[in-house]
Design a protein with these regions (language model features):
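Catalytic Walker B motif of ABC-type/P-loop ATPase nucleotide-binding domains
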Residues: 246-250
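A hydrophobic transmembrane-helix motif
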Residues: 1-33
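Helix-to-loop junction immediately C-terminal to a conserved catalytic motif
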Residues: 135
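Cytosolic ends of transmembrane helices, especially the final helix of ABC transmembrane type-1 domains
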Residues: 34-62, 72
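The feature captures the beta-strand-to-loop junction immediately N-terminal to the Walker
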Residues: 120-122
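C-terminal portion of ABC ATPase nucleotide-binding domains
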Residues: 265, 273, 282, 287-331
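ABC ATPase nucleotide-binding domain helical subdomain, centered on the C-loop/LSGGQ "ABC signature"
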Residues: 61, 146-149, 178-218, 240, ...
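Primarily ABC-family ATPase nucleotide-binding module
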Residues: 63-115, 146, 151-156, 269-272
Length: 331
């Protein structure tokens, strides 16, 4: 930029028959240099300003969310305080626009304390969305939530601190197995191994050269998909120890069927007093659950225990027969 300005100045002076003094060029060079420096500094700082503005706006959204949640009087779910949570006529859309597609439609659920409940259905049927809504990750505009006979004015947000959600996709960090399990919290080795036993991973960890102190590469690329899921599941189960309701979003989808069955049996035995709701893909787990909700296109099309669904729902029978046939051909 500096040389362009100087060249233009000299060119037009000579063209018009003027005289170009060396001192004038030197002074002009100094001024143009300063202006250029200011221009580049502004461009650099402007980028930072945009980033900072974005960060401030995002933090305001988060702060507002915490403020709103802080205004909610948390309703603690003590052991003797509740018997059933009822969900009535719940609708939900990821889009706020009026008339947008509904991802959950007219959902009715009855969740009894201590029950083990399964959500089944094809991918995209609404299982994961329902779990996220129950955790309070999304606001509800339509639908009533009752704790026994008491209507919850702030829906699931009222009780969200009593609910833990363990997602399907495991998050792994570039640190040790132990740190991935505890996330820096103080946990004694006995407790850690208790949860490794629960997810059938103790033997695998003990076979590693440094056991709990073995390193995990970023994103867990040195672990199998099943190992990553079981580490994440053990971490989530440990963190959910004081929660009343546990939501599981296909946390063992990458684990082999035999291990998966044993893991669910272990979880249900250890957390027999907790209400556990799990979306599942492999139907061989269904007999472990008290109640099953069958999702399709954002709706619940059937519910009941395994025998009831098999008797009353043709779609469930077809799904079950298809699953059994697929399992027999893969053996």
């Amino acid at each position: 930029m500096t040389f362009f300005v100087l060249f233009t100045f000299i060119f037009f002076n000579f063209k018009n028959g003027g005289v170009v003094l060396l001192g004038t060029v030197y002074v002009l060079y100094g001024y143009v240099g300063r202006i250029s420096h200011l221009f580049y500094n502004f461009a650099y700082v402007y980028g930072d300003i945009v980033k900072q503005k974005t960060a401030v706006l995002n933090s305001e959204i988060i702060a507002k969310s915490f403020k709103e949640r802080g205004a909610i009087k948390e309703l603690r779910l003590y052991k003797k305080d509740w018997k059933v949570i009822s969900v009535k006529k719940l609708d939900f859309s990821y889009h706020e626009k009026k008339g947008a597609e509904q991802h959950l439609k007219n959902i009715d659920l009855v969740i009894k304390k201590g029950q083990k409940i399964a959500f089944i259905g094809h991918s995209g049927s609404g299982k994961t969305t329902m779990l996220k809504v129950m955790r309070g990750l999304y606001a509800l505009e339509k639908g009533d939530i009752y704790l026994d006979t008491k209507e919850l004015q702030h829906k699931f947000n009222t009780i969200s601190q009593n609910i833990a959600l363990i997602p399907q996709e495991p998050e792994m960090f570039a640190t040790t197995i132990r740190e991935n399990l505890t996330l820096g919290l103080t946990r004694n080795t006995k407790t850690i191994y208790q949860f490794l036993d629960m997810v059938n991973l103790r033997k695998t960890v003990d076979q590693m050269p440094r056991k709990l102190h073995s390193s995990v590469v970023e994103k867990g690329v040195n672990l199998s998909g099943g190992e990553k899921q079981r580490i994440a599941l053990a971490r989530g189960l440990m963190a959910a120890k004081d929660k009343e309701i546990l939501l599981l979003d296909e946390p063992t989808s990458s684990v082999d069927s035999g291990n998966e069955f044993e893991i669910y049996k272990n979880i249900f035995a250890t957390y027999s007093d907790k209400t556990i709701i799990s979306s599942i893909h492999r139907l061989h787990l269904l007999n472990l659950f008290d109640t099953i909700y069958f999702f399709e296109n954002g709706k619940i099309i059937a519910s009941g225990n395994f025998d009831e669904l098999f008797e009353t729902s043709l779609k469930f029978r077809n799904l079950w027969e298809k699953y059994k046939s697929k399992q027999s051909t893969s053996v």
